[in-house]
């Protein structure tokens, strides 16, 4: 029975991946931060829950003790979203965005690579179309995904001598609890802004909120993301990148043939409300 480590497995895409792989006969070592989530994961067949905060360096360094000597794959799924105009970003929030979405993912890979080498295993990173496209208000999140894309590319080439594939999953908006609560999160972010920034960016904040509502309606099926992860783990020749929805592909196709000045104007208009 193959074994896989899935981080951020307690909800959303991570939980869907965990359920799918356990049903397919994988031994899933699934991480979650809270004791309650660990307990819930423990009720699933073939799932071995591990309580872990991926930003806890000592805990991540000790992660191999909770895993089998031979590990067939790791799916780096843990992540958060920090929203807001760059001018108003709290630097601590920006640091946490990069820590959770970038540094901690690399820390996990560094910790388990010896076990992956024994199995000639695979590395999968949960990236995003936001690692290829940046919209106003998404600078921090996009920065984390752009960084992850670059690090994954470097890692893929560096691991070639051991034939360890590295794949990036690049979904767009997906129907999960994270996206379901996106408007509430956005409103909390807006409430935390200073009055001056709220006034300066009023049109942008209102426009971005409308866009979020539209994107929630267009959010894709999480099954498509789960199937992309499955292919990355089981295909004889896994792809370097898996794009999961038509909306994201259309956006990328638009960017490929559009001058930056025009795409900037289009994206700025899409995230600005005139009333």
Language-model regions, residue ranges each:
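Conserved glycine-rich cofactor-binding loop
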Residues: 10-11
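Substrate-binding pocket helix/loop in short-chain dehydrogenase/reductase
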Residues: 85-86, 93-95
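Active-site helix of classical SDR
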Residues: 109, 144-147
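Residue(s) in the substrate-gating loop at a strand-loop-helix junction
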Residues: 128
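C-terminal beta-strand-loop-alpha-helix "lid" module of Rossmann-like NAD(P)-dependent dehydrogenases
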Residues: 161-213
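Conserved NAD(P)H cofactor-binding loop of Rossmann-fold oxidoreductase domains
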Residues: 77-82
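The beta1-alpha1 cofactor-binding region of Rossmann-like NAD(H)/NADP(H)-dependent oxidoreductases
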Residues: 52-62, 91
